[in-house]
Amino acid sequence: MRERTEARRRRIEEVLRRRQPDLTVLLENVHKPHNLSAILRTCDAVGVLEAHAVNPTGGVPTFNETSGGSHKWVYLRVHPDLHEAFRFLKERGFTVYATALREDARDFREVDYTKPTAVLFGAEKWGVSEEALALADGAIKIPMLGMVQSLNVSVAAAVILFEAQRQRLKAGLYDRPRLDPELYQKVLADWLRK
């Protein structure tokens, strides 16, 4: 039993050393549990520490088995509205890119994800709202070559977040701890209780 406990602690410390506090997602009214769960699972896979959500209906997000338990390892901060979410991210130095099917949107691979970055994803059916687009620093898109012009929101999140991971790996951002020591200890204590 002691070996399992020590192995678990080592694994938690290894994962925590790679967490990227300056890479996140902002989810605008993404309310389907399977999409939210899949996005959080991808966030965990690429090292996102905290995701953000705005749900205008005020409901508390729910998860399903798609998360693989990742909602325990990626914090989800729910904001009361878009302005509060943007204020929170901007005060922390994030550039916010909204995903959008627009002519003026940049190819998602042209963005430098090694800088503090939040990627905004919109509701499953409608995408990012005009209000959110107006607040964002820029719009990005995943080029589509087929007849279908959009991907499921959780698939789009995976595509973009793994590009961010690729860039960050190349820049060596996973090679050293990114959390300040106080936050590291706080999160470590929380994770060890789970």
Swiss-Prot record:
Q: Which InterPro entries does this UniProt record tie to the protein?
A: Alpha/beta_knot_MTases, rRNA_MeTrfase_SpoU_C, SpoU_MeTrfase, TrmH, tRNA_m1G_MTases_N
Q: Where does S-adenosyl-L-methionine bind?
A: 99, 122-126, 142, 151
Q: What is the effect of changing residue 124 to A?
A: 2800-fold increase in Km for AdoMet
> According to the UniProt record, what happens if one changes residue 101 to A?
13-fold increase in Km for AdoMet
- Superkingdom in the source lineage: Bacteria
Q: What is this enzyme's EC?
A: 2.1.1.34
Recorded catalytic reaction(s): these are: guanosine(18) in tRNA + S-adenosyl-L-methionine = 2'-O-methylguanosine(18) in tRNA + S-adenosyl-L-homocysteine + H(+)
* Record has S-adenosyl-L-methionine as a keyword: yes
Any one of the GO BP annotations: tRNA guanine ribose methylation
Q: What SUPFAM superfamilies does the entry give?
A: alpha/beta knot (SSF75217)
Class of enzymatic activity (EC top level) = transferase
Q: Which UniProt keywords apply?
A: Methyltransferase, RNA-binding, S-adenosyl-L-methionine, Transferase, tRNA processing, tRNA-binding
Single GO term (MF): tRNA (guanine(18)-2'-O)-methyltransferase activity
* Function as written in the Swiss-Prot or TrEMBL entry: Catalyzes the 2'-O methylation of guanosine at position 18 in tRNA. Type I methylase, which methylates all tRNAs.
Q: What is known of its domains?
A: Both N- and C-terminal regions function in tRNA binding, but the substrate tRNA is determined by the catalytic domain.
Q: Which family does it belong to?
A: Belongs to the class IV-like SAM-binding methyltransferase superfamily. RNA methyltransferase TrmH family.
What else the UniProt entry mentions is:
Binding of TrmH to tRNA is composed of at least three steps: the first is bi-molecular binding and the subsequent two are uni-molecular induced-fit processes.
| The protein's assembly and partners | Homodimer.
Can you say what this protein is called?
tRNA (guanosine(18)-2'-O)-methyltransferase
| Organism encoding this protein | Thermus thermophilus (strain ATCC 27634 / DSM 579 / HB8)
Write the lineage as a comma-separated list. Bacteria, Thermotogati, Deinococcota, Deinococci, Thermales
